[in-house]
């Protein structure tokens, strides 16, 4: 029964460090990993590969229901595998991003992907990375963590990432975009970005990633020992 398979949900706003934390925890525990944020991009890419109209809800639903996708974390790197092929770079293109925003607008597609995400719950356990993992997708998860950081700190982290890749970045614009996205996510009607009532809220503003990983793993192991 899947309810007996442990899940650790990691929710929170963009830039809080969820991805890095989830990869580290999946590797430390030897568990499966779900990057829910990439799911819509993977579906969009699958639709493009199979010449499925990304504006047809009817055509997208069966594709979403049987989406063949896996997430593999090795040495801190996440590999996104679609139908046996590494598509980690391909899902980051603008074409896929545009298509993803279209497929995500369909309620029946979202419902099909909700069921598909729950199917990732396999032994020995699952680390689920997202924004509504603990509130909507896995409300019965024994361990829920809401990873947060100030908008200012998240903007600085994002700026450093982009500068390392050679991009010229305007900090104030980045900060404004992050605040706007936070506002949209926290105030949307469906699955708003809020901590689950039983989640540990972990503020990473003053912590480095090693400290975040240590605190999260310690909390998870304590909770799982008594679950």
Curated annotation (Swiss-Prot):
User: Where, by residue number, does the polypeptide cross the bilayer?
Assistant: none
Q: Which domain of life is it from?
A: Bacteria
Protein's cellular compartments:
Cytoplasm
Keywords per UniProt: ATP-binding, Cytoplasm, Kinase, Nucleotide-binding, Transferase
- Asked whether the keyword Repeat is assigned, the reply is no
Q: Where does ATP bind?
A: 12-20
The UniProt entry lists the main location of this chain as cytoplasm
- Quote the catalytic activity from the record: CMP + ATP = CDP + ADP; dCMP + ATP = dCDP + ADP
Q: Which GO terms describe its molecular function?
A: ATP binding; CMP kinase activity; dCMP kinase activity
Q: In its UniProt record, which GO terms are filed under biological process?
A: nucleobase-containing small molecule interconversion; pyrimidine nucleotide metabolic process
Write down any Gene Ontology CC term. cytosol
Task: Tell me which InterPro entries the record gives.
Answer: Cytidylate_kin, Cytidylate_kinase_dom, P-loop_NTPase
Coiled-coil residues are: none
Similarity comment: family membership: Belongs to the cytidylate kinase family. Type 1 subfamily.
NCBIfam families assigned to the protein according to its UniProt record, in alphabetical order = cmk (TIGR00017)
What is the designated name of this protein? Cytidylate kinase
